[in-house]
Amino acid sequence: MKPFLRWCFVATALTLAGCSNSAWRKSEVLAVPLQPTLQQEVILARMEQILASRALTDDERAQLLYERGVLYDSLGLRALARNDFSQALAIRPDMPEVFNYLGIYLTQAGNFDAAYEAFDSVLELDPTYNYAHLNRGIALYYGGRDKLAQDDLLAFYQDDPNDPYRSLWLYLVEQKLNEKQAKEALKARFEKSDKEQWGWNIVEFYLGDISEATLMERLKADATDNTSLAEHLSETNFYLGKYYLSLGDLDSATALFKLAVANNVHNFVEHRYALLELSLLGQDQDDLAESDQQ
């Protein structure tokens, strides 16, 4: 190719790439990242005052530490949450909800064997604690134990077939086992559902029934305020990231996982595992390493 023609080709390619990136940014739906509320700050201050009091029984102290840990977790303060959960467990080692949170943190840190043990403890203490099946299933999924993950996530799905996110996680696992059968099973679950929750729109996208543009238009139309918009975006961007990851489009997947995290919906499963996905993609997660790998 002659130098002049080569230059024209490169210039045209750069121009088209710039237009494509610009169009992507203009069409992107964004929310204001969630921030701590005054009510949450007041509750934390009040909890601190009560915990400083000596007029608490052991059971009361353990419960309050757990509740403060949950609040810390919802604000993204995982190191403080883990500290409260550990203190609660030292006082009362029979709290399944505490083992559940610790198992989630261990999964996020990639410490899967310890996570399995934590979720096993949850179900030993309370066999009806169904979310342990979700969280253990996710840990097994990331740990590469796909058949066991399918068993847990199928049990979780069967408890509420109208919850779209149960179908989505089950599909992500079954996709690794047999992609064609997984798609057929997802379609069957979609058709049997009441389709009332927002997440079924994501399922429709996965099935190829709607485009990504239609999905995002429905998202904007469904959101009633900034909080619901941020929550829907955290969910949708995570599952879009998983979709593009399955296609081998690592750049789009990485961008979408970052967008899922950017909304600060810290207590959503999609936010938690978008961080893990970024870690697996080689993105630096210094806070994750420092707080969880102990």
UniProtKB/Swiss-Prot annotation:
Lipidation sites (N-palmitoyl cysteine): 19
TPR repeats, residue ranges: 62-95, 96-129, 234-267
First-listed, main subcellular location of the protein, grouped into a coarse class: membrane
Tell me one GO biological process term: cell division
- Residues lipid-modified (S-diacylglycerol cysteine): 19
How does this chain sit within the bilayer?
Lipid-anchor
Subcellular location as annotated:
Cell membrane
**The entry's keywords:** Cell cycle, Cell division, Cell membrane, Lipoprotein, Membrane, Palmitate, Repeat, Signal, TPR repeat
Q: Where is the signal peptide?
A: 1-18
Enumerate the Pfam families for this protein: TPR_16
Q: Name one GO cellular component term.
A: plasma membrane
Q: What PROSITE patterns does its record include?
A: PROKAR_LIPOPROTEIN (PS51257), TPR (PS50005), TPR_REGION (PS50293)
Q: Which domain of life is it from?
A: Bacteria
Q: Give the intrachain disulfide bonds.
A: none
- Function recorded in the entry: May be involved in cell division. May play a role in bacterial septation or regulation of cell wall degradation during cell division.
Oligomer and partners: Homodimer.
- Show the PANTHER family listed in the entry: TETRATRICOPEPTIDE REPEAT PROTEIN 6, UDP-N-ACETYLGLUCOSAMINE--PEPTIDE N-ACETYLGLUCOSAMINYLTRANSFERASE SPINDLY-RELATED
Q: What is this protein called?
A: Lipoprotein NlpI
Q: Which gene underlies this protein?
A: nlpI
